[in-house]
């Protein structure tokens, strides 16, 4: 099994607010196996790993595994402890979670990714790391291996079955459109007006046809901020072309918007979990600031989305995309 070539003493967690306890210290956890999970409540890849983390907690917490969720925020609003606490409750996370607001733990681990998993053995050494989704079977093998090294001689359960079809053998993960940020700091707005940091800008017309993949266009009155674009009048529109099987958008605060996919309402077999149908039209509805699921399809292909915002004051941060599909 792949492993860290030269095991190193694991760094201690940096001071931070414990969203869910009890607090954990790497030093005082000697004798136990610790899995440190760097995650973010609006990160689609992080959210997709949670079913496995929760299952491992249920399977192995009584046998000496301690999972610690380190929430390192990507956005200013996800540094709010109450936002994180709400996400922890909504996702049903059962293990301790610390808010890494200043990225102290992120820097101590020299981490660069969401999600990232680090396994620490009973002696306090880093033994295994994995970045991104996947390798769930390999990670569970390492959990079992380190528990055995710590003295657990009882039979181990068989590996957890894949929780999604796209995690099973035979699924194909295609190159997809990269995460698309909307704010001026990292965004790629296709508009003759361009970005005007901190200003309200009226975008009068979209360019002919959809924007190239990875770029987007808007119409109506929008406020340009570093992390997000904010609607400033009813009826503002956002236009995106992407290649993906699933499409998500980080939005703040609670609200709703109309979604069209390829010039029509989102078909029933491709609707994300937050899409509802009303009078033959499809809308995304969300009850708190979070990642909103717009499209969820078993098929990977090019998609053209148009979003219409019925109210001002909605902040749109970034699109993320799922890429894995089941061959037909």
Task: Say what each PLM segment does.
Residues 30-34, 62-66, 93-95, 122:
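Loop/turn elements at helix/coil->beta-strand transitions in domains of secreted/extracellular proteins
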Residues 111-113, 122-150:
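Non-catalytic, surface beta->alpha helical segment in thiol-disulfide oxidoreductase systems
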Residues 1-24, 29, 137-328:
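Non-globular targeting/processing and membrane-anchoring segments
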Residues 34, 114-116, 254:
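Short loop/turn microsegments at loop-to-beta-strand junctions
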Residues 24-47, 53, 67:
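Short active-site neighborhood of thiol/selenol oxidoreductases, capturing the structured segment around
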Residues 84-120:
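Short, internal strand/loop/helix patches
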